[in-house]
């Protein structure tokens, strides 16, 4: 099945404490979650690993968000948009449902 949200897509968060924030999708996980750049920052406590020369301490990183809580961002309308699929020249392409423009 083709994915509506893919890596490097610009998305906007629809729900949660980061509602309204925009960012680029850095990773799409197989369990229906995405990691968005600069959104849902968490603090992890990491142990030092002297063998690898890794220091311990508090590390800030992005956590996964469910794909249903983000929507693709349409730069023409400056709003969140829905994604549709259609065939053009024998290829399946994604398009914005608001203005039928190919992504």
UniProtKB/Swiss-Prot annotation:
InterPro entries: KOW, Rib_uL2_dom2, Ribosomal_uL24, Ribosomal_uL24_CS, Ribosomal_uL24_KOW, Translation_prot_SH3-like_sf
Entry's Gene Ontology molecular function annotations: rRNA binding; structural constituent of ribosome
Keywords, alphabetical: Ribonucleoprotein, Ribosomal protein, RNA-binding, rRNA-binding
One Pfam entry name: KOW
BP GO annotations: translation
SUPFAM superfamilies: Translation proteins SH3-like domain
Cellular component GO terms, alphabetical: ribonucleoprotein complex; ribosome
SMART domains to which the protein is assigned, alphabetical: KOW
Function statement: One of two assembly initiator proteins, it binds directly to the 5'-end of the 23S rRNA, where it nucleates assembly of the 50S subunit. One of the proteins that surrounds the polypeptide exit tunnel on the outside of the subunit.
NCBIfam families registered for this protein in UniProt: rplX_bact
The protein's assembly and partners: Part of the 50S ribosomal subunit.
Family: Belongs to the universal ribosomal protein uL24 family.
Protein name: Large ribosomal subunit protein uL24
Species of the source: Mannheimia succiniciproducens (strain KCTC 0769BP / MBEL55E)
Gene: rplX
